[in-house]
């Protein structure tokens, strides 16, 4: 039985499905959720809810939700225990990068990030793929689910934002998947999405990252300072990769009560996920791919409530920078 057929066998025993996106969902996660919703409805699942934790702060991601009219519900307003089945898309582990408690076992998991098995009834994790959307496009093709303009547009944009717009190792599968959905996509919507990339807050954060950058060889560390926009960190990291001679970037910043990390690398010798794990695993939750990774460290490890923001960032920055360069074996 194919993986798509196995997925259908689980859905056919389900009347209600909660599709859980990871915190602060990006287009790959959201488009994958839409694809699973389409497959579920095509196989007579009566109630489908797409839920997420965190916030959608990235201007482009907000435009993605609004232009494609994606119906979402926050996890705080979703009683997932009342659904027959719970699905994770673009993430695998409860309690990690999701507000879902660690003691909840999902019934369906589809992801392209490496991770430990969670004993779901259906689990399809392909870390050799460049995007979760690619996996769902293969499902849609095999199951002959009607591809609406809305879904095709969402999937095509997700493929571009996750892989095809970057040097970060898109696989042949991403190009083939893009060709499959391209004829049904609305290119005007994609143009509008590309025109909504940066909010003023994100531009300010990128400016702080540029000003604070510290470089050793082809590697660079920068701070966005204190920001309310989690998505500003990966955007700043992507931007700094454009600096001549730089191939590896770590951006950090304080978001709420945590220090957020976002790493990017186009150096084939650097595994960013392993590098962050080596440098920061004992401090918080970190991990990711060969070319992109992230993490979250509780601010309480470094600070008291009364600490001055500027002094705190200087204190934290020095330690994070040293740990990152040490993990890359880069001397002063």
Report the location of each language-model feature:
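Anionic-ligand anchoring segments at beta-strand to alpha-helix junctions in alpha/beta enzyme folds, i.e.
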Residues: 16-75
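Gly/His-enriched, cation/cofactor- and phosphate-binding structural elements
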Residues: 5, 12-17, 22, 30, ...
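Secretory targeting signatures
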Residues: 1-4, 10, 29-32, 162
């Amino acid at each position: 039985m194919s993986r798509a057929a196995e997925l259908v066998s689980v859905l056919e025993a389900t009347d209600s499905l909660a599709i859980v996106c990871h915190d602060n969902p990006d287009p790959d996660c959201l488009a994958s959720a839409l694809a699973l919703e389409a497959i579920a409805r095509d196989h007579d699942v009566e109630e489908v809810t797409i839920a997420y934790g965190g916030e959608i702060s990235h201007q482009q991601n907000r435009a993605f939700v609004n232009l494609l009219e994606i119906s979402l519900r926050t996890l705080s307003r979703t009683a997932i225990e009342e659904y027959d089945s719970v699905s994770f898309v673009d993430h695998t582990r409860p309690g990690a990068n999701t507000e879902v408690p660690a003691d909840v076992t999902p019934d369906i998991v589809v992801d392209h990030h490496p991770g430990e098995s969670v004993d779901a009834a259906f689990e399809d994790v392909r870390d050799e793929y460049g995007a979760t959307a690619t996996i769902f496009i293969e499902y849609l093709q095999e199951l002959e689910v009607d591809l609406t303009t809305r879904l095709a547009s969402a999937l095509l944009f997700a493929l571009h934002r996750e892989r095809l717009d970057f040097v970060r190792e898109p696989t042949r599968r991403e190009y083939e998947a893009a060709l499959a959905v391209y004829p049904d996509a609305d290119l005007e919507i994609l143009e509008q999405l590309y025109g909504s990339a940066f909010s003023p807050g994100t531009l300010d954060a990128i400016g702080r990252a540029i000003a604070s950058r510290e470089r050793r060889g082809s590697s660079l560390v920068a701070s966005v300072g204190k920001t309310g926009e989690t998505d500003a960190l990966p955007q700043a990291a992507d931007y700094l990769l454009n600096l001549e001679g730089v191939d590896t970037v770590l951006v950090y910043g304080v978001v709420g009560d945590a220090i957020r990390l976002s790493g990017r690398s186009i150096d084939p010798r650097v595994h960013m996920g392993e590098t962050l794990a080596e440098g920061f695993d004992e401090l918080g939750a970190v991990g990711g791919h060969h070319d992109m990774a992230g993490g979250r460290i509780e601010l309480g490890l470094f600070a008291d409530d009364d600490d001055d923001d500027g002094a705190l960032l200087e204190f934290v920055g020095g330690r994070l920078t040293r740990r990152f360069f040490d993990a890359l074996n880069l001397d002063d």
